[in-house]
Amino acid sequence: MSKFTKRILAGISALLIAFGGIVALDEQTDSASALNGNMFDPGLIVSDSVFYDFGTMTVDEIQRFLDSKVPVCKANDGGPTCLRHYKMDTQAKAGEAGRCDPLPAKKDVSAAQIIFDVANACKINPRVLMVVLQKEQGLIQASNPTAYMYRAALGYGCPDSKPEICGKGSTITGLFNQLYRGAGQLQWYGDPRGSFTYLKVGTNISVKYYPDDNRSVKCGSKTFMLKSQATAALYYYTPYTPNEAAL
């Protein structure tokens, strides 16, 4: 199994755990052992009521969850520390209609506080944000993270196929910018005023098994009924799904 497939499956497993009630979010259960392919419904990865429930966790609860995933941080000298210990200054955000509310500038802010602040500003469940952080760069469970993992934390504007476009100093890079912009995009995907309306709940949609159309071997796609706007938002953000063999 490729690293790419393993990472996608890890993200799907995390989604099932966080949203499907298979195990509690703060349990020390191994996600791979908890995942059963028969449980995965590509048309209902998460309900709207869960996805947009931004008040599910306090800062302390988020911090305890991060602590539980990396009991021992093994960051290299000169490299970034683990997410549980990570702190940074955050700049003020003016907010944008249909995406996120304004946020003030802060000094020396923990990752848990950033996740909490962004979840409340953008009205997205903090569990969703943590799942996407794990799916995109593996930050939740990274004991020795790289600078790039923070630069492209939520994968916003940083496609796997072109990592070079996710440059230093950009207004979209870094943990805070990635969370704020990425969460805002997830919120915008559910706004009927936006341009992302082609995946319609209650209709059959076709989603590819692999995002790159330029591969020499085509991987095909799966057709299924879309059952929630939140699931549509996830497919807009990450437009592929695992096949049965991968599950």
Roles of regions detected by a PLM:
Residues S2-I12:
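Bacterial N-terminal signal peptides that target proteins for export
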Residues A97-P102, L139-T173:
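Substrate-binding clefts and substrate-entry loops adjacent to catalytic sites
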Residues G21-N36:
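Sec-dependent signal peptide cleavage junction
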Residues P104-A112, A121-P126, T146-M149, K168-L179:
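Solvent-exposed, acidic/flexible segments
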Residues A119-C122, E136-S143, A183-R193:
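Sec/Tat-exported extracytoplasmic proteins
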Residues S13-G21:
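Hydrophobic core
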Residues D48-Q137:
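Export/targeting segments at the very N-terminus of extracytoplasmic proteins
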Residues S33-V72, G157-L247:
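Non-catalytic cell-wall polysaccharide-engagement segments
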